[in-house]
Amino acid sequence: MSSMILPTEPEALPNRADDSAALEAETRLRNDIRLLGRILGDTVRDQEGAAVFDLVEGIRQTSIRFHRDDDTTARRELEAILDGMSASDTVKIVRAFSYFSHLANIAEDQNNIRQMRVGSTAGSAPRAGMLAKTLAHARADGIGAAELRDFFKTALVSPVLTAHPTEVRRKSTMDREMQIAALLDERERVQLTPEEWEQNEEQLRRAVVTLWKTNLLRRTKLTVLDEVTNGLSFYDYTFLREVPRLHCALEDQLGGGEGAEADAELASFLRMGSWIGGDRDGNPFVTAEVLHGTLQLQSARVLRFYLDELHELGSELSLASHLVAISDEVRALAERSPDHSPHRRHEPYRLAVSGIYARLAATAAKLRIDSIRAPVGEAEAYASVHDFKADLDAIHRSLVAHNAGVIARGRLRQLRRAADCFGFHLASLDMRQNSAVHERTIAELMNAAHPASAYLEIGEDARIALLTAELRSARPLTSIFVKYSDETVGELAVLHEAAQAHATYGAAAIPQCIISMTKGVSDLLEVAVLLKEVGLIDPSGRSAINIVPLFETIEDLQASSAIMDRLLGIPEYRRLVDSRGGVQEVMLGYSDSNKDGGFVTSGWELYKAEIGLIEIFEHHGIRLRLFHGRGGSVGRGGGPSYDAIVAQPGGAVNGQIRITEQGEIITSKYSNREVGRNNLEILTAATLEASLLQPKRVAPQRDYLDAMEQLSAMAFKAYRGLVYETDGFVDYFWASTVITEISTLNIGSRPASRKKTRAIEDLRAIPWVFSWAQCRLMLPGWYGFGSAVEAWIAAHPDKGVPFLRSMYQEWPFFRTLLSNMDMVLSKSSLGIASRYAELVPDETLRREIFGRIRAEWHASVDGLLAIMGHDKLLQGNPLLDRSIRHRFPYLDPLNHVQVQLLREHRTHDPDEQILRGIQLTINGISAGLRNSG
């Protein structure tokens, strides 16, 4: 079934005679795609019949002609084929193309892993983004191991997983796909006999048939705790093992290994974070009960991991007392062990480990978590993870002191590091809520306690005075004699649960309280007062939690420096920051700022906000930690993490960074252990590079800043002019995209809109970006750039394109901005988008708006290529270019089918099968694009 493997005209292999490794990798990728395509084709024919397979192939070939040549005859043929299909056949066709996208992604991912391995085993020079490269750079700059260890003592690199609903695949589907990936990996790594090759292919066939017979779509809506459980899967896949391994590898490189003194050990700097189960902004289903359940699920996952590792460690530490000496600490642990087996009487390390296991099992039982294996006897629960770690450290010291350090460097070392990184809470859970909810809650409490306050009517200065007075007061603001609204009761219940979590799991369990849509100083003080009510802040100025403003809109980004300047000048708030080690975190929102002002202006205002915040924090003597709320798509701040971090203005990283990992990006980065390790290494290397090796980077020349300011203003005008100022644009958007149908997918627990309106302002950023990706316009990732470049060149004929090209070559920020736009535009298709435009019933509106979009697209591509000095999109990114050419012949038909189904769905009586077909196309297109939300 070779016709269902590659595009009709096979892509030419790269002409790299001097690069045999790259050529071999390319060949192997094509072979893997051929293999999986053949197996899928056989599956479609066997399960659905030859007629369905022939239909798939006919649609694919016609779609290629239309896409490649803009062939109007092919377009008519395609429409005729689609019109003639039954609803049942349509669903089968969609599933075939969707699964090919999934399988092509697997082959690509395995090829990336293959190339990473080749780079490591062949002894080639380390590439940018690898720690080896960054450490070599540091050595060349005269930065030694001791200085680097000092850096990591206060460093923080924290990927924060969120449940943003952009991962459309079910976990069952992902599990099967991981099985297929493992089988491909086996073919790569293991020297198989002919019989084993046959067995491997048979297993692949079973997996693909199982995939074909598995529901692609969720039949029920996810609950928040479902999302929590899904998120925890990535700890099993990657984090629980790779986070400790990365620390240990870096420690070895810096000389803090086996026999190192305590002060030479590398501090744990890589900390996992999560919003899943703690993000209440717009999600009424995140309650105190859900917060409690989330923390319990997280703790259960990490304690079971520790117990499993202790069980294995006990098996390994069979050292006999007459063959190895032990320390007094280990002797005491062995004597306290409830393990009285005569077989282990002379195996003190095993006795010590079984005692630790018993104590940890008792800890799990105290937290109402069932352990995997019953302990050998009863023991006292650990009061904290520090006590658990102290016992592990005692075993480590004894082994090292008695010539068994090589044993200490195995499983025990990894477990000690895991305990340090994950504690008993696994990941730090952020709480997040909208500032408007805090405002209403405080207003109700204030009006009950101070009836004359009229909190909602008074100005910002009066609010600040009232709130700071409350922070100084030891008297509670709430009263058991007042009946509060359900919203206020719910908010206070969540905060009380957070305080209880600190007592149960430690302060690291919930270290941040984030305020979305922060617009003023009072927004932060309101949260401080609420936290004081539950004991997380006391009147003396000590705080057990960080209060984090989130600046999201263009206007709020522009005001962020002034807000933080005034806030840090308030003694009551400054004391809270000082009690937290003099560190203040600020979160920057990439998604809403993009929806508000467009891609160019969002990127520029974020950059300027960082520069302003750096200056303000230096003035106040406070350490700034930035938390980047980036999405998967470029329209929501996505793009290569290394480039994004290194392109930050000088002083923005300063050793600490937090960054969101959302939706389908979590899966692509962390479902495979090797890929996950590589991505964690990239974050670490970029943080080190931006902090130590580029701290005094020369600021961009004034001309560049001025040009960027002008480009931003021009792009802003074009973007706002289309999205917010064009009559009928809202109608065009709702008619020409799948925004309505997206809400029928069971991909998340959160509603798509903040309010029940059709206004763009009220729409969440994710469905906004997701919808434009589905219709292949990707408008949030580029619109306005072309107009801005044309207008700027017209206003500066003396500088023109050469000046902008110098700006691109010399300024990392501008280079990263354009590189991301290059990626977005390469995935767009005006031909396909024109078919979605035909769904708009008003022909005049359709012609006017799509005409503007088409003209802006051409202007943006022309401007981008001129500035980059390229002849075509992705000229500087051959890997992505190749990827798109492999996958898109199977992606484009899904768009054509989706348009046809949308037309039927919107013009006929409701049909469950047609709606299911639309949902399947959304799934398949999302998989093909890879970062669509």
UniProtKB/Swiss-Prot annotation:
Substrates-to-products reaction catalysed: oxaloacetate + phosphate = phosphoenolpyruvate + hydrogencarbonate
Keyword set includes Magnesium: yes
Keywords of this entry: Carbon dioxide fixation, Lyase, Magnesium
GO MF term set: magnesium ion binding; phosphoenolpyruvate carboxylase activity
Gene Ontology CC: cytosol
GO biological process: carbon fixation; oxaloacetate metabolic process; tricarboxylic acid cycle
NCBIfam families (UniProt xref): PRK00009.1
Family, per entry: Belongs to the PEPCase type 1 family.
Protein name as catalogued: Phosphoenolpyruvate carboxylase
Organism of provenance: Rhodopseudomonas palustris (strain HaA2)
